Amino acid sequence: MKKGTLTLFLLLAISIPLCAQYVVQGVVTDSLTKEPLPYASVRLKDTTEGTTTGSDGRFYFKTHRSEAVLVISVIGYNDYVRTIRPARNASYKVALAPTEYALGEVVVKPKREHYRKKDNPAVEFVRRMIESRDNYSPYEKDFWQRERYEKTTFALNNFDEEKQKKWLYRKFDFLTEYVDTSAVTGKPILTVSARELLATDYYRKSPRSEKQWVKGRKQAGVDEFLSKQGMQAAINEVFKDVDIYENNISLFTNKFVSPLSRIGTGFYKYYLMDTLQIAGEPCADLAFTPFNSESFGFNGHLYVTLDSTYFVKRAVFNFPKKINLNFVDYMLLEQEFKRAEDGTRLLDHEIITVEFKLTEGQDGIFARRVADYSNYTFTPTAEADKAFTKPERIIEETEALSRPETFWAENRPQAAISQQENSVDRLMTQLRSYPVYYWTEKVLSILFTGYIPTSKEAPLFYIGPMNATISGNTLEGPRIRAGGMTTAWLNPHLFGKGYVAYGFKDERVKGLAELEYSFKKKKEYANEFPIHSLKLRYESDVNQYGQNYLYTSKDNVFLALKREKDDRIGYFRQAEMTYTNEFYSGFSFQLTARTRKDESSYLIPFLKKEGDTYTPVKDFSISAAELKLRYASNEKFFQTQWTRFPVSLDAPVFTLSHTIAGKGVLGSDYTYNHTEAGIQKRFWFSAFGYTDVILKAGKVWDKVPFPLLIMPNANLSYTIQPESYSLMNAMEFMNDEYFSWDVTYFLNGWLFNRVPLLKKLKWREIVSCRGLYGHLSDKNNPALSDGLFAFPIENTQTMGKTPYVEAGVGIENIFKVLRLDYIWRLTYRDSPGIDRSGLRISLHMTF
């Protein structure tokens, strides 16, 4: 398969064609300009059947009706109304004429629209809806439960005969057996991944809790080489359950302003379009569109009952054509609601349809997620009581992943059955029998994970990470490294990890050996959440003073290019035992017993100062105990082989740690106490972007040599690294207490979207500020106190009353993947050997 297509597929999506007897399809254009009209409403009158046009103006849906009235409408154009006979399977070419029409006191024009909120009946209608949006909310009930069936599929889009004849696909002539037809676009598609879920959802108001009991989960497709848990967490985060009554709707890791938001009337234009019957009830067709089509909002329709409840029977959302959103070429969200006997609104059916494209000109990925909800109950059950006693939010039955096909045949809704979709596992078996696909999958696995599996399925051992194989520095010269780790397929409780490295200049072997016992049975990797383990670890390697890359390996080849000489390096040897316990509540703690020996080098000598005498010291030891506390409520991860990345930063993360060592205890040369605390939080500003804030503070309480002091984290590379300083030199400052901040504001194009030229580029603005206020007490300053190691770097300094501050402005979304920041150093600008400003770069792929 095409590398680009597979890359895009890994950005996640979903699909599920529905079957019907007759096809209604065609294209809608502007009668004057002949240009296609995207997002026009296409429906059969007095029914809920229909769709909206895609970005190319085309529409496609199926119906069982042999005769119906087709209505096509879009803001600023005359409606198209015609009796059709779908049984003829005709294709309709509809040219809509622009018009000027009245909505009460509101006048709408096709080109220059003079929209007014004052005295606009649609705006007043929406205000009343917003005021009553919590009425009949299911979340006002004390309890409810429901059954959920969910199907998520990915498919190669527009897999027509022309594409099938290309050399890449001619090798796999059997693919034609699996081609299906999209019920939305009418294009042929090839489903390459399918996921199914059968579960029961539980909700309790007080104390507030939501649980999901998974009875069955099924997965097959080209993404099998990735972590199953990681992919599922990422998909769940990208395609979150949508509540249109919230102020913001979370999709594609972003937040979009809901048409029923408290700020909705300032963000959207609203129009009362028509009155129609939906499920036997007269409903107003309320259309909406953002004032600024590049902003993070929706076009769409809400079909609202004409009574005092303002009940939404059906919702249809899509993205404006010009929205500043990456990789999503088309999105359609459809929700249908029903009422309980007491009027409570219940979500009955939901479909999210997406067309993903990595670049223009590609057919990309067709994706769809369908969710059916049934059997709502408002009386607590024994099963619910059992679920609420479980600590995890998602409870998965032991046999959930191994359900037989008979289970799915019995529980799968009839509408979700598609022979092509449900045979993805058979498709994958045939694909992997071809060497060209087998090796392509292997290469992609290495590129995306950084590791080489030692077997085709359920690998016992991974070799890697490959991006750390070659690196170098001033002390070691060229450095090579090889390593790997075991998996749960070898032993679900016992895990090993390690590497061996060699420097050709210092001719020394370094390495790491780690053995971890997990008290919980793991499915794939040792670091799966939640961790409850005991770990033994020994490491002997170089110590790059003042550099601590928190989000990547120090051996990452992409960090090899430095803005200054990397010569603040010594050696260390460390043995430790760590007990870790993570809880589903988000709280975790870690206890570590550690003995460490730091060794000097010709670059970083240890010279002990006594008056005017400096005595060389080869090394020193510290034996310490450490306690770390962490709380991150509702944190979700994308799981990889070697680490896990949070996929949601909405909830705050609190950390607190303390390290203690006593002189003479287990060979420790010093008494050492070090305390650190931190908080991290993402703040969303609806249409105005979001801000990531990281605050930290720490203190060393005792008299210790400089390797045990607090050295701000200097980033010597030209890449953008969080929680590090792009223009600070390594070991430039020494502190025994500090307070730091890292604030980055992502505007999501809020300003650029208003500049005609820039909004076409879809660039997005970034403003950042990082700083640190530190202090070094006299007892830890070798210039004022004897018995300490002299600072080995001539330019090392202590801070006065002025904090170190650097600020930057940047542009992200350059070619959809690049971020460029220009950074200024605002303080300590006259220090010798420093950069006052500089350009930094990173790869940053985001929706």
Which residue stretches match the model-derived regions?
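Extracellular beta-sheet/turn segments enriched in Thr/Pro/Gly and aliphatic residues
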Residues: 85-111
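Short, acidic Ser/Thr/Gly-rich low-complexity loop/linker segments typical of extracellular
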Residues: 48-58
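Structured extracytoplasmic
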Residues: 101, 107, 111-283, 289-297, ...
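Short, ordered, surface-exposed loop/turn motifs in non-cytosolic proteins
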Residues: 22-24, 31-46, 65
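A short, amphipathic beta-strand motif
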Residues: 24-30, 57, 94
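Bacterial Sec-dependent N-terminal signal peptides
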Residues: 1-27, 42, 101-110, 526, ...
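Exposed, low-structure sequence patches enriched in small/polar residues
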Residues: 250, 254-256, 388-847
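A short, solvent-exposed loop/turn motif at the edges and junctions
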Residues: 44-46, 71-82
